[in-house]
Amino acid sequence: MNNFVKQVASKSLKPTKKLSPLDEVISLNECIISFNLDNFYYCNDGLFTKPINTPEDVLKSLLIMESFAYEKMIIKGLIKILISRAYINDIYFTPFGWLTGVDDDPETHVVIKIIFNSSLISIKSQVIEYLKPYNVNNLSVLTTEKELSINTFNVPDSIPISIISFFPFDTDFILVILFFGVYNDSYCGISYISPKERLPYIIEILKPLVLEINMLSDEIGRTSSIRIFNSTSVKKFPTNTLTSICEIVYSFDESSFTTPKTFTPLNASPYIPKKIVSLLDLPSNVEIKAISRSGVDFITHINNKRLTTILVIAKDNFLKNSTFSGTFIKENIIWKGIYTYRIIKSSFPVPTIKSVTNKKKICKKHCFVNSQYTTRTLSHIL
């Protein structure tokens, strides 16, 4: 989490007012939850590399997670339980490694690092009870020797700067970070999460309380920062205590703030839902609209209907040099024994398959070769 905040805030100007800590210190312990997923077979040995973990890398990891719907359901459900009882430090899942930080790879499929100041017995029992129906194995819920002491500070007279991004551990939420000053080498402030639907309200609430808002915008393939400036007189932020910026996040309680009367329309979002698709999986003989941005081609409309989830096109060698920007129509075919597709109409240049004549239309199978029943999974013909 600390690495994520550092990366998200790296290009934003932050207050440099030096703060003095209070005598009160927040003491926290670390717990590591790890387990294997039953019947989960996956290997990326010799291929996987992720040296930095930028916000773009985190968004890519979340996109990869969409290809593992069952595993995502288990992990996301567990995260929702933990958020109400502890603070999430990081998540490990074999296909994408550590979600926000950089660390050694563990030996289990899933690891969740949390910090807490409540009862470990209660957390452990909730974890065990939740995972019981999912047949996980090698489950471990253990505290480490790592103890964290978080300094606290009074709210200074300086005006804070706010950064808004997606919350990496649950994209149903946005992350709101307010920077007030510094102590030694650490920035000091307070962090909140709020349902993503409340983003316009959060922005209007913050405007009279901060010098500026820097919102991370998901541009599909890259991120940008949108600066929103305050145009009204600044009011004092309604909190009494700050901490060093860390894993501690609070739920944003809108009742503690003045209700905004107007809202500015937003044409950007910290997180856009998306998943990877093969052109084989798209419907045949209907118009499909695609956009290309930052080296990523994605689909926004099918059959004149806007999609609620962006579909990122996974290109094969046949179309690797094509840029999908416009509309196209495709159809699935059996060509030389291979189940594939061809583009039959497009507003942009694409290579074509000149002949699709195949009288027998026999497709080579990956297994069950003697069966008269033929279909495909997402990866195989059988």
Swiss-Prot record:
Q: What does this protein do?
A: Binds to the hairpin form of the viral telomeric sequence. Might direct genome encapsidation into the virus particle.
Q: Indicate where this protein resides in the cell.
A: Virion
Task: Show the GO cellular component annotation of the record.
Answer: virion component
The identity of this protein, by name, is: Telomere-binding protein OPG082
Q: Which GO terms describe its biological process?
A: viral process
Give the InterPro entries listed for this entry. Answer: Poxvirus_F5/I6_dom (IPR007674), Poxvirus_I6_C (IPR022219)
Q: Which organism is it from?
A: Monkeypox virus
Task: Name the source's superkingdom.
Answer: Viruses
Induction per the UniProt record: Expressed in the intermediate phase of the viral replicative cycle.
Sorted keywords for this record are:
DNA-binding, Virion
Single GO term (MF) = DNA binding
Q: Which Pfam families match?
A: Pox_I6, Pox_I6_C
Name residues in a coiled coil. none
- Give the record's family classification: Belongs to the orthopoxvirus OPG082 family.
Encoding gene per record: OPG082
- The main location is virion
